[in-house]
Amino acid sequence: MASRNKLVVPGVEQALDQFKLEVAQEFGVNLGSDTVARANGSVGGEMTKRLVQQAQSQLNGTTK
């Protein structure tokens, strides 16, 4: 099934893929179809958590 997610910032896909690989490596997860959904989902959840924290920091005028 095709993904319906649209990226707000054009050209950011490569950076998100790199970010996903970094988080997966930290968690010890090998991304792919042979990995259980729970492990793949944990990577996506952590990415979301970090991106929200980064956005909140930027809105508050602080940077990490």
Swiss-Prot record:
Gene Ontology BP terms: DNA topological change; sporulation resulting in formation of a cellular spore
InterPro entries per the UniProt record, alphabetical: SASP_alpha/beta-type, SASP_alpha/beta-type_CS, SASP_DNA-binding, SASP_sf_alpha/beta
Entry annotated with the keyword Cytoplasm: no
Site (Cleavage): 22-23
A GO molecular function held by the record: double-stranded DNA binding
PROSITE patterns: SASP_1, SASP_2
Keywords per UniProt: DNA-binding, Sporulation
Job of this protein: SASP are bound to spore DNA. They are double-stranded DNA-binding proteins that cause DNA to change to an a-like conformation. They protect the DNA backbone from chemical and enzymatic cleavage and are thus involved in dormant spore's high resistance to UV light.
Family as reported in the entry's similarity comment: Belongs to the alpha/beta-type SASP family.
PANTHER family to which the protein is assigned, alphabetical: SMALL, ACID-SOLUBLE SPORE PROTEIN A (PTHR36107:SF1)
Note: SASP are degraded in the first minutes of spore germination and provide amino acids for both new protein synthesis and metabolism.
Protein name, as recorded: Small, acid-soluble spore protein D
Organism: Bacillus subtilis (strain 168)
